[in-house]
Amino acid sequence: MDAIVLWLREVFLEPSVTQTIIILSLVCALGLQLGKLRIGTISLGITFVFFVGILASHFGVTTDPVMLTFAQNFGLVIFVYALGLQVGPSFFPSLKKGGIAQNLISLGLVLLTFLLCILLYYILGISMPNLMGIVAGATTNTPALGAAQTTLHQINPDATAEMAEMALACAVTYPLGVVGVIIALALLKVMMPKVEERDDSEAPKAFFSEYEICNPALDGKSVREVALLLKRPFVITRVWHNGKVEIPTSDMILYFGDHILAVSGEEDTSQLEILFGKREMKDWNRPDIDWNSVDKQLVSRRLVITRPKLNGVRLGMLKIRNLYGVNISRVDRAGVELLPDRDLRLQLGDRLTVVGEGKAVERVAEILGDEVKQLDNPHLTTLFGGLVLGCVFGMIPFYLPGVSMPIKLGLAGGPIIIGILMGAFGPRFHLTTYVTNSANLLLRQFGIILYLGGLGLASGANFFDTIIHGDGLLWVGAGFLITMLPTLLVGWASIKLLRNRYDGTAGMICGSTANPMALDYVNSQLKGDGASVVYATVYPLSMFVRIIFAQIMILIFA
């Protein structure tokens, strides 16, 4: 019996590498199970992992500190990098369609947070180092805490006690920082539910429309010549001549009275109607369109790009229409239909809808690859290479005018920026950054859960003592105010005054507060990745500004 007790103590209580893995796994598993509980319509989800870690640490569970720090930081790096890869392809298009405005709103939230912090500094008399710890916890921004501690240490190398208090203030306010944003987002959704019904995608979508050629100037011109007349991207996918449907080539001649089916951006249909003469009212975008019946003698197949050498190649360089007499009517990328423009850069995993004669479609399938099983093979070289670049980039010091100490983005800021760049531009350099949706979700969930479990175990030992005794309750109250007030004000203004969608506003708030747990809550409530795209759009700049502001506040008020 004694041997069993000693063995159990060794496995669960004595800090070691194995014991840390066991405890961390137990905390994560129990937290995930509790995260399924709902209070009304609100569920904290994976945030429960953090609270279970705090409870375990409070009741005396200790782990190997080195292992715990590694697990926590490695989980954070995996999460932010995978998030960057996910939203990378749509990140820069989103900047052109509202991203700059979202960043300005996000900066307004950051500025309001620090103005409130200055106000509390004079009203409550809390020291600025402790306030920076409170702000770091209330906005779940641990890199800002690290930057403030570094600045304080450079000002006063003997400020060890103050630095420890800053970390404790962060730990005490962190839970309500997580929960407060989730509560604020839930309140915004309840108060303004109708905003959810509006939908306009950040990504360009393919829109089908039929036209009759009534413009005499087009009679006898080739498809290539007609395409040059309009400075907007569109593709003629089918031509009806004398009642017979054909797949057009660039040299096909169009005649007065022909009917054509074109794919373009929806906003360009009015210009196409002016060009061709008359637009038919039939809705070609209905999901119940029987394309096989439309094409009759033609074959329509969805082919998947699995040949690595095509990664990053422009669609027009393949010359599929002219060489094989087939037409590409759709390009599906991660569930988003893109306009099959000749300048579109193809990516591994893109699904192309190809229409033409059976044998020609088969030849195109051989060129594209169309072997779905190949997509299941992970491209780990690019994955780990991106992690290396992200961590290195996060350690690069940036020197700003008027700030004596260098600024670093750290493990939270560096990897997400590199992930975005890899996802957006990797294919142009023939880097295979494709990750299946399920694999990307696994990486993100695994990373953030590991981070939360480690953070809870690391910060829970003195959590309740600090709340009950000393200034703990004051810190908690100040932190909750810093979390809720700017979030509700900016969120209300974004939705009500600026007429932004809820998912974009929620993603902006999560990114501005560096709150991936709240982002996970939002994603569990909504369809699509609109919130994740906006999160990654505003996260780098808001993170950078918060780090700078934290250091400036210490320099001015400490």
Swiss-Prot record:
SUPFAM superfamilies: TrkA C-terminal domain-like
GO molecular function: monoatomic cation transmembrane transporter activity
Gene Ontology biological-process annotations: potassium ion transport
Pfam families (UniProt xref): Asp-Al_Ex, TrkA_C
UniProt key word S-adenosyl-L-methionine: no
One Gene Ontology cellular component: plasma membrane
Keywords in alphabetical order: Cell membrane, Membrane, Repeat, Transmembrane, Transmembrane helix, Transport
Presence of the UniProt keyword Protein biosynthesis in the record: no
Protein location: Cell membrane
RCK C-terminal domain: residues covered: 196-278, 286-370
Chief localization: membrane
Membrane topology annotation: Multi-pass membrane protein
Spans through the membrane: 15-32, 39-61, 76-95, 104-126, 166-188, 383-405, 409-426, 446-468, 473-495, 533-555
Family: Belongs to the AAE transporter (TC 2.A.81) family.
Record protein name field: Uncharacterized transporter PG_0562
